[in-house]
Amino acid sequence: VRQELKLELKQGFKSRIEDVREEILRKRRAGKLPGDTTSILKQWWQEHSKWPYPTEDDKAKLVEETGLQLKQINNWFINQRKRNWHNN
């Protein structure tokens, strides 16, 4: 009986451990945007380098073109301006 209980517990936790492992891996990958989407954003950035603040319409188009969420677009531009834009 004890051996059966041990085996039962092991089987139950095994699937949960696998679920947690997959979730961790998925969250790690979440940090970087796909290259094809960043190339679209970078192209917009280069075309508007003097004033890289997209309008709401610009953002809506970028959401449509990239498939990213509006928050991701906003964060990308915030980070890009902090890292790469020097307003003269």
Curated annotation (Swiss-Prot):
Task: Write down a Pfam family by its short name.
Answer: Homeobox_KN
Q: Name one GO molecular function term.
A: DNA binding
Query: Which Gene3D superfamilies does the UniProt record give?
Result: Homeodomain-like
DNA-binding region at which residues? 25-88
Principal localization reads nucleus
Q: Where in the cell is it found?
A: Nucleus
Q: Which InterPro entries match?
A: ELK_dom, HD, Homeodomain-like_sf, KN_HD, TALE_homeobox
GO terms of biological process kind: regulation of DNA-templated transcription
Q: For this UniProt record, give its keywords in alphabetical order, as a comma-separated list.
A: DNA-binding, Homeobox, Nucleus
Q: Which residues form the ELK domain?
A: 4-24
Recorded superkingdom: Eukaryota
Q: In which tissues is it expressed?
A: Highly expressed in the roots.
- What cellular component GO annotations does this protein have? nucleus
Q: Which family is annotated?
A: Belongs to the TALE/KNOX homeobox family.
Q: Which PANTHER family does the UniProt record give?
A: HOMEOBOX PROTEIN TRANSCRIPTION FACTORS
The protein here is known as Homeobox protein knotted-1-like 1
Q: Which organism is it from?
A: Zea mays
Q: What is the lineage of its organism?
A: Eukaryota, Viridiplantae, Streptophyta, Embryophyta, Tracheophyta
- Which gene specifies this protein's sequence? KNOX1
